[in-house]
Amino acid sequence: MTARMDKRFAELKAEGRPALVTYFMGGDPDYDTSLGIMKALPEAGSDIIELGMPFSDPMADGPAIQLAGQRALKGGQTLKKTLQLAADFRKTNDATPIVMMGYYNPIYIYGVEKFLDDALLAGIDGLIVVDLPPEMDDELCIPAIRKGINFIRLATPTTDEKRLPKVLKNTSGFVYYVSMNGITGSALPDPSLVSGAVERIKQHTKLPVCVGFGVKTAEHAKVIGGSADGVVVGTAIVNQVATSLTHDGKATADTVQAVATLVRGLSTGTRSARLVAAE
């Protein structure tokens, strides 16, 4: 783990609560608004930030995140600007871990070595690249780890006992358990199935296990956080941005505050998760 990531999970373990991991799309709907959102996330209770890298062909994302990426690209967002977003955030916040999430194509075009160097300079702690399987670890995963950047893998309900060790082999930071098959923004999974899956993964790794896909409300966060080391929320936040925009997709005076209000509620749910689990 990077020092920031390691420290954050150690703090959360001492507090006896799961992490709230919040995803937003870099550059949605514009650079300045997304920077405002990024700064507001930890103030509202987010423990770890997932910074989305917009891409024109996001095959694993549902309609909400696809639209967010389109808005960002339309507004001129690039991978370089997404790295700059993190660097600007770091000017006022050096404590909150940042994980960049997206697809390999923009990184490949940017140049892997240059991307990793620039990511380090920007204060990036980890990467989630959804279309790079373990068989392609030499492409980005191994170089990232050598630079001191975590490479976070996804496990799913179909990741069986034979496949799981391969998925976890070079994983660092935390494991992201995708709680259901399909695209982002799906319905809430069965909590008992999630609990069993987290236990199964923990038999193979000492890393924290964070659960995402389908978490939209404080109550969802409370339930899922009862068994997971972290709760990941993405689509609900992206939807909150979208509903605050003008009819032509421009930010309003309410955009940042709307996201902050949602995240405060999610934080309350996450922080009460272990109390519920202990009852």
Swiss-Prot record:
Q: Which domain of life is it from?
A: Bacteria
| Enzyme Commission number, as recorded | 4.2.1.20
One Pfam annotation, family name? Trp_syntA
- CC per GO annotation: cytosol
Sorted alphabetically, which InterPro entries does this protein's record hold?
A: Aldolase_TIM (IPR013785), RibuloseP-bd_barrel (IPR011060), Trp_synthase_alpha_AS (IPR018204), Trp_synthase_suA (IPR002028)
UniProt keyword annotations, A-Z:
Amino-acid biosynthesis, Aromatic amino acid biosynthesis, Lyase, Tryptophan biosynthesis
The UniProt entry, under SUPFAM superfamilies, shows: Ribulose-phoshate binding barrel
A GO molecular function held by the record = tryptophan synthase activity
What pathway, per the record?
Answer: Amino-acid biosynthesis; L-tryptophan biosynthesis; L-tryptophan from chorismate: step 5/5
What reaction(s) does this enzyme catalyze?
Answer: (1S,2R)-1-C-(indol-3-yl)glycerol 3-phosphate + L-serine = D-glyceraldehyde 3-phosphate + L-tryptophan + H2O
* Catalytic residues identified in the record: E50, D61
State the protein's purpose.
The alpha subunit is responsible for the aldol cleavage of indoleglycerol phosphate to indole and glyceraldehyde 3-phosphate.
Output the HAMAP family linked to this UniProt entry: Trp_synth_alpha (MF_00131)
Q: How does it assemble?
A: Tetramer of two alpha and two beta chains.
User: What does the sequence similarity comment in the record state about its family?
Assistant: Belongs to the TrpA family.
What is the protein name for this chain? Tryptophan synthase alpha chain
Native source species:
Rhizobium johnstonii (strain DSM 114642 / LMG 32736 / 3841)
Q: What is the lineage of its organism?
A: Bacteria, Pseudomonadati, Pseudomonadota, Alphaproteobacteria, Hyphomicrobiales
Per the record, the gene is trpA
